[in-house]
Amino acid sequence: LLSIFTLTAVAKAIYQKYAGFDETETTMLIETEMYKTHLLSDVTRYFSFFTDAGNFGSNMGFATILFGISAIFMKKRSIRIYYAIIAMCAIYALFISGTRGALFGPIGGIILLTFLSKNIKLMGATVFFGLFFYVFFAHTYIGESNTSIRRMRTAFRPTEDASYIVRKENQKKLAEYLKYKPFGEGLGLGGVEARKYGSRLTTLIPHDSFYVKTWMETGIVGLVLFLIIYVSALLRGCYLIMFRIKNNELRGILTAIACGIFGMMISAYGNAFFGQFPTGFIIILFLSVLINGEHIDQLLTEKLRTKK
């Protein structure tokens, strides 16, 4: 089901790229002032049928990792090919979304994969390709004529990115303002989109990050609680994958899920998409599958015994 959803999202984004935005999308871009962040001078950021390009790009990063890793562990050749095609389509969609932070989703997922695999050769290969990837974006100008590559490259050169510098300055202001507000300003009072609910510092500064938004609304207490819950669930899932799951195919799928969620959590630092639809639903659903992996493994084992 998710594979069909992903392919549909990619197809819609490609349609936007080559046929343009429809009347409803154009109206939304204008009325919500999304055109300021999506219709840039050097690149157009496509968002498919998602709420915005940040949400779309990050979900495509998740799909890249989920289907890319799953393709490695699937037994049937036809399914492996199908998943690999989806992963390639998703990474293409990530680039045309123009979401720089989403690029760190697949990178984070691959890093976690090396630890979960407990494979020295894979770790070595990951380090090699990671260095190659970093050098390509941070220290070369190869492909600079391509607007998508040029925009993604700025993520590896933050000191040259004006928006990054502004974000850091805004976070300094918020740190001073929220110093004596451990529970934050209140739900719904984070980011410029909340101006209609009240004028205060947290509604005058763009959050540009899900974690900053959570910090604004619920304070350091809420942010720490959120991270404890999600990190604990993810670590529990990683433990099950490494030491408890016996079915190889299931282990591969759960590894893909864990790596995808980890990548999304990293990507959420640069984009406030984590609580938006359908991301929030997808994350909770897959976390539930992940932490119930041992139970699923037992059911599969019983099913195989019954067949024998």
PLM ranges: what are they?
Residues 47-54, 182, 202-237, 262, ...:
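A conserved mid-to-late transmembrane alpha helix and its immediate loop/hinge
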Residues 1-28, 34-42, 48-116, 238:
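Alpha-helical transmembrane segments of multi-pass inner-membrane proteins
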Residues 71, 82, 90, 107, ...:
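Hydrophobic transmembrane alpha-helices and their immediate junctions
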Residues 8-10, 89-93, 131-139, 261-269:
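Aromatic-anchored segments of alpha-helical transmembrane domains
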Residues 65-66, 107, 256-308:
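Transmembrane alpha-helices of multi-pass inner-membrane enzymes
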Residues 11, 16-21, 97, 114-158, ...:
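A membrane-periplasm/extracellular boundary helix in multi-pass inner-membrane enzymes
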Residues 25, 75-81, 121, 247-251, ...:
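Transmembrane signal-anchor hairpin modules in multi-pass inner-membrane enzymes, especially those
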Residues 29-30, 34, 40, 142-145, ...:
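Long extracytoplasmic/lumenal interhelical loops at the membrane interface
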